[in-house]
């Protein structure tokens, strides 16, 4: 497998939720071909892009939410060269202008069928100009741009729809031992990048532990664990790095892993203007895949090299699960995919064997397989925290328990067999669930 290609495409910084990020990128790309700001914007979105962008905070948008606002910001102030960080430089004036555009009804959206699960089409209009930009296949992949009906750009790579790039096809076929061995083979440059991702995500967790972002899941749980308030009420109150992260050596490590990982999701879902390292196209996947092993490495005194290999395994397991279940699915990938990756990484850091790590993955599947995705929002911090805690529990069971010796329901001790089950459940069994969730989101839950 092309390890470098996998990590270059699948593990990268992302600002805010990646679904409205893809929408903002499409709008920013289209806006490049207009001589002045658009008068109208129309979005055509896959059901999953619609679902995951409907209720989530937009970075730098002062608490405002949704795909339509993301598209307006992208069109008025986005930088397409920044990919999933297209909104990194938006200002308060930009937010006011974008809000005005949406409030006067100039931004509309619709769900379209028979498109890839990752599909965001932004149509921008002003007199004499109609520009359409399409992001498809991956959140940061601009597939096509049309200006007044003429194609001015079309992606040259072979990716189309939901087809898999070669490295993901390799992951789909891989045995668990292959993932373990590939993680062994990372070079020094990749190891540094993986460690940088851990630093990024722990820094975001620090913010969530110190301040009550969103539902304040991590902040509240962290306060309870510390027996006091870690809130930073003053912008000038500089705290030492790590001062708000609960001590991972304490008596209830699972609770500390849960609080810290949830805290990072609190910050991200609230729309903080701070990037995280993503995994498999999702920032929350990245938080779940990275933070539990990073905390464990700190607690157990593991070397940077050991942590880097564990993180590589976590991302590879996450990617392998997503290769089977799909990029965006009715299942919560933070739990099923990234939780499995984190569990495998924790076993590796504890000097466990590949067989024990494979057991841990199966135990995560058995625990959280039924968790649904009802769109990105503040409540994702609850699911991310649960996934992190279950990853810890699964690792402990795999290291110290008897393990699974045969199938438990539709989960097998064999990694590939379980992935086949997950793929079928996701694509067939949960298809109606997605339809129902989107109908409820369109109608509005009171």
UniProtKB/Swiss-Prot annotation:
Pfam families: SDH_alpha
GO aspect biological process, one term: L-cysteine catabolic process to pyruvate
A single GO molecular function term of this UniProt record: L-cysteine desulfhydrase activity
Entry-linked InterPro entries: Ser_deHydtase-like_asu, UPF0597
Family membership: Belongs to the UPF0597 family.
Name recorded for this polypeptide: UPF0597 protein DvMF_1488
């Amino acid at each position: 497998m092309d390890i470098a290609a996998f990590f270059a495409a699948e593990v990268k910084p992302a600002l805010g939720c990646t679904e409205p990020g893809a929408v903002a990128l499409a709008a920013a790309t289209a806006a490049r071909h207009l001589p002045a700001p658009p008068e109208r914007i129309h979005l055509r979105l896959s059901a999953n892009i619609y679902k995951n962008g409907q209720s989530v905070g937009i970075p730098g948008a002062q608490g405002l939410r949704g795909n339509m606002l993301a598209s307006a910001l992208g069109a008025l102030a986005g930088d397409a060269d920044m990919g999933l960080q297209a909104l990194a430089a938006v200002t308060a004036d930009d937010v006011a202008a974008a809000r005005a555009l949406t409030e006067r009804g100039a931004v509309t959206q619709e769900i379209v069928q028979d498109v890839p699960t990752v599909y965001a089409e932004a149509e921008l209009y002003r007199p004499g100009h109609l520009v359409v930009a399409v992001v498809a296949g991956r959140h940061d992949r601009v597939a096509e741009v049309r200006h007044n009906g003429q194609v001015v750009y079309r992606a040259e790579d072979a990716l189309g729809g939901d087809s898999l790039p070669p490295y993901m096809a390799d992951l789909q076929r891989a045995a668990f031992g292959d993932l373990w061995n590939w993680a062994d083979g990372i070079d020094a440059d990749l190891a540094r990048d993986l460690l940088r991702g851990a630093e990024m995500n722990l820094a975001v967790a620090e913010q969530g532990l110190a301040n009550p972002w969103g539902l304040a899941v991590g902040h509240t749980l962290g306060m309870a664990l510390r027996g006091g308030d870690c809130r930073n009420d003053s912008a000038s109150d500089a705290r030492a790095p790590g001062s708000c992260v609960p001590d991972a050596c304490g008596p209830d490590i699972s609770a500390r892993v849960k609080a810290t990982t949830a805290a990072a999701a609190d910050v991200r879902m609230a729309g903080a203007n701070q990037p995280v390292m993503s995994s498999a196209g999702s920032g929350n996947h990245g938080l779940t895949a990275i933070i539990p092993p990073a905390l464990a490495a700190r607690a157990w005194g593991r070397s940077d090299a050991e942590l880097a290999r564990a993180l590589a395994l976590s991302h590879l397991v996450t990617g392998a699960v997503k290769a089977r279940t799909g990029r965006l699915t009715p299942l919560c990938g933070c739990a099923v995919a990234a939780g499995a990756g984190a569990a495998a990484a924790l076993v590796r850091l504890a000097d466990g064997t590949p067989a024990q790590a494979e057991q841990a993955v199966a135990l995560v599947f058995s625990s959280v397989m039924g968790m649904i995705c009802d769109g990105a929002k503040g409540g994702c911090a609850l699911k991310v925290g649960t996934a992190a805690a279950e990853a810890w529990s699964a690792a402990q069971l795999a290291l110290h328990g008897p393990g699974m010796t045969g199938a438990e329901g539709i989960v097998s001790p064999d990694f590939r067999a379980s992935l086949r089950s997950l793929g079928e459940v996701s694509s067939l069994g949960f298809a109606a669930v997605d339809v129902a969730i989107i109908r409820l989101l369109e109608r509005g839950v009171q």
